[in-house]
Amino acid sequence: YGFSLGLQMMTGLMGDTDEKCIKTAERLIALSPDTVRIYPTIVLENTPLADYLRDGSYRAETLNEAVSLCARLLLMFRENNIKVIRLGLHSGGNVDEGYLAGAYHPAFRELCEGKIYLEKMLSELSKLPKDMPYVIEVPEKSIGKAKGQNKRNEKALLNNGFQCKIKGNEFLNDYDIKITEDI
């Protein structure tokens, strides 16, 4: 028909739960859009949501909560060949000045993708002995995401008892990993 369908969803709205967001994502997937945008709710000064936050009738989604949920959503859309073209608000405009609460981070998508890699690495490593060093290969372009912002994923692997080196592999697809013993 000469056009593409792009849909948007928000997480962390009043009365929202992770389960409701997953249901929303499933409904969006059923519509077979070409693209999706996902925006965690943030609270800005001088808005009704700011009043609800102050009177206790609304609790803003934390950054960690939003990262965990949006990482799941990102994988859901990817598994259905739907491109997520935006994940989180970009800085600028009134966001920086009026921000009160909610999941706002200038590198929000990177945090979500880092979470995906961390969960995959920990899941695979949990099947292996902890007393040996490993090499974890990830897509070449995703080394930074796999290591995590400020190397948080590398630290988490170490805190879980795994000594790992993360290296690039140009033949792996997004979010795929390969673990071998470091000889």
Predicted regions and their residues:
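Radical SAM enzyme core and accessory elements
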Residues: 93-183
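C-terminal scaffold of the Radical SAM
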Residues: 1-132
